[in-house]
Structures are given as C-alpha cells and as structure tokens.
C-alpha cells in the first residue's frame, strides 16, 4: 500500500507542476486556481498517510512482540473487552481469532457492536468485572492506551483517505468545467487558440496527459493513471 501511495504522490506532484505552468499564462483562471489548491491539499494528505503507516506498523509489531496474551482463548468464549468508542470495558463474545496477528473479532453483548481487538486486551469475564469495579475512574493501562491510540489513528487516516476521494471527484468536476469553457472559447475564437483541455484523457493506452500549451519545452508529459481503483480501503493503514 505504501508503494501505491508513493506512486500517487508522484503523480499528484507532476500534475501540480503542469497546472502551475498553465497558470503562468492564465493566472486568473478560477478553475485552474481551484485545481491547484486541491492538488496541494491532496499532496499534503498523501504525505501524512505515508508518514503514519510505518510508525503504526512498527508500534503494532513491537507491542505484540513484547506482550503476548496470557489467557488461552477460543471462539465462543465470553470475555471483557475495551470498546474503542469510549475506552470502557464491556462483556463480549469471541467470534473469530487471528492467531497470526494476535487479534480477535468480538461482539459486545449489550449493544451488539462488532470490533477487532488485540487478544492481549481481552480479560476473563469475572476478572474483567472485578477490575472494572475496583478501578472506578482509574486511568487506562499502557496496553489499553496503545490499542485506543491505534484505533484513533486509523479513524484519522480514514478521514484523510475520504478527503482524498472527495478531491478526486472535485478534480473530475473541474475537468468537465474546463472542457465546457474550452468549447465556448473555441467557438468564439476563429484562430482556435484554445483547442484542448489540459485535463483530457489520452486517446490510446499509450497516450499521456499533460499541458501541451504551457510553453515548457523538453519536459516529459505525465503518464496517465486511472485513479478510480484507489478507494478508501486501499489508503487505510494496515
């Protein structure tokens, strides 16, 4: 996934350079200015996602390697688990166990919410109830804090990925607007100074996308990439 994001980042940067080149000759074009702003935002979001992935993976592996579960769990067991929404402990049932990653899919008895949580965070029902009664408002343990922090980072990354998806859609809308503007300008201009959208898709699989009228020579065009396959789940940290 990091490799995919890196490729996307390179593509966004190349597109930004082309838009900036187009703006050098048409600096007041609102569509180009909006596209430049969107590209700058999506570049920053993609950088954030790339920077958070290695640290989360490392934190996950370190915490799992240093703390193995002391209880032998099996599917169908009742347990006490921390709900990520409020950090409180509730009774749950184990639906599935992933021994390789040290996690369990559980369903909370009260609300019926399903969640995946580290096995090391699960406690036997009686032990968990007693700990909950004794602790009162006692701060969460280090293990619980790590689990909660990981969940928070995943949710934050999901929001960033969703924003990238929204920006991709906005760019498609901007492409349509540019094409409409292009057609109107060409119909009024007999000399045909504006003939083709800088956002136009290639006419063949070997075609390229780029600014042909930017006045920059000897610079390669950006390879056309279909970004529709990159959805939110592709961008989420593992």
From Swiss-Prot:
Give yes or no: UniProt keyword DNA-binding.
no
Main location (coarse class): nucleus
**Where in the cell does this protein reside?**
Nucleus speckle; Nucleus, Cajal body
Residues with Phosphoserine modification: 201
- The UniProt record lists the Tudor domain at 72-132
Q: List GO BP terms, alphabetically.
A: apoptotic process; mRNA processing; RNA splicing
Instruction: Point out the signal peptide segment.
Output: none
Which UniProt keywords are present, listed alphabetically? Acetylation, Apoptosis, mRNA processing, mRNA splicing, Nucleus, Phosphoprotein, Spliceosome
Residues modified as N6-acetyllysine are 219
* Superkingdom of origin organism: Eukaryota
- Where can the motif Nuclear localization signal be found? 142-160
Q: Which GO terms describe its molecular function?
A: RNA binding
Check the record and name the InterPro entries matching this protein: SMN_Tudor, Tudor
Query: One GO CC term of this entry?
Result: Cajal body
Q: What is known of its domains?
A: The Tudor domain mediates association with dimethylarginines, which are common in snRNP proteins.
Q: What does this protein do?
A: Involved in spliceosome assembly.
> Quaternary arrangement and interactors, per the entry?
Associates with spliceosomes. Associates with U4/U5/U6 tri-snRNP and with U2 snRNP.
Query: Which family, according to UniProt?
Result: Belongs to the SMN family.
Quote the protein name from its UniProt record: Survival of motor neuron-related-splicing factor 30
Task: List the source organism.
Answer: Mus musculus (Mouse)
């Amino acid at each position: 996934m990091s490799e995919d994001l890196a490729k996307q980042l390179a593509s966004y940067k190349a597109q930004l350079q082309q838009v900036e080149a187009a703006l050098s000759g048409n600096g007041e074009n609102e569509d180009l200015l909006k596209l430049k702003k969107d590209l700058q935002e999506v570049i920053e979001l993609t950088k954030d996602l790339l920077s958070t992935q290695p640290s989360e993976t490392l934190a996950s592996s370190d915490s799992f390697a240093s703390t193995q579960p002391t209880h032998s769990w099996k599917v169908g067991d009742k347990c006490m688990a921390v709900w990520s929404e409020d950090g409180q402990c509730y009774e749950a049932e184990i639906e599935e166990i992933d021994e390789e990653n040290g996690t369990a899919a559980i369903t909370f008895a009260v609300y019926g919410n399903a969640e995946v949580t580290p096995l090391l965070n699960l406690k036997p029902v009686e032990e968990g109830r007693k700990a909950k009664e004794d602790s009162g408002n006692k701060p969460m343990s280090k293990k619980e804090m790590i689990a909660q922090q990981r969940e928070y980072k995943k949710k934050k990354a999901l929001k960033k990925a969703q924003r990238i998806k929204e920006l991709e859609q906005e760019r498609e809308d901007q492409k349509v607007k540019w094409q409409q503007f292009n057609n109107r300008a060409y119909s009024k201009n007999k000399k045909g100074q504006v003939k083709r959208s800088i956002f136009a898709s290639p006419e063949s699989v070997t075609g390229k996308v780029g600014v042909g009228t930017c006045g920059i020579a000897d610079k390669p065009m950006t390879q056309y990439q279909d970004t529709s396959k990159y959805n939110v789940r592709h961008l989420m940290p593992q």
